[in-house]
Regions:
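Hydrophobic structural segments
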Residues: 1-108
Length: 108
């Protein structure tokens, strides 16, 4: 019998200028708490690539052309009961038409 995880690791990719807005949004929705600490996260710089298909409106670059943009990879923890709200907050605060993010279950 498999039980649901108590928490998840949320990883998202964002341009540096939107870092604070996305962090503020996910923290306000309940992410980033570890014991008595709040707003816990980790981030590092990298390069994101994407090619917007027909009918897309990329915030950066143009549809039909592969783009390479500097981005940050941001990680934080999310309690299972806050996951849906945190993901909604991330999508609302993120500047991209299709935000890239991953959710990983954490072992207890």
């Amino acid at each position: 019998m498999t039980s649901e995880p108590a928490s998840y690791k949320l990883v998202w990719f964002v341009p540096e200028e939107a870092l604070d807005a996305t962090r503020d949004a996910v923290f306000a929705a309940g992410a980033g708490r570890i014991g008595a600490y709040e707003r816990c996260s980790w981030y590092a710089a990298g390069t994101g690539t994407f090619l917007g298909g027909e009918g897309t409106s990329p915030v950066l670059g143009e549809a039909g052309r592969e783009e390479r943009v500097p981005e940050l990879r941001v990680e934080t923890v999310v309690p299972a009961d806050r996951l849906a709200d945190v993901l909604g907050a991330l999508r609302a605060a993120h500047p991209y038409e299709e935000p890239a993010y991953d959710v990983y279950p954490l072992a207890s």
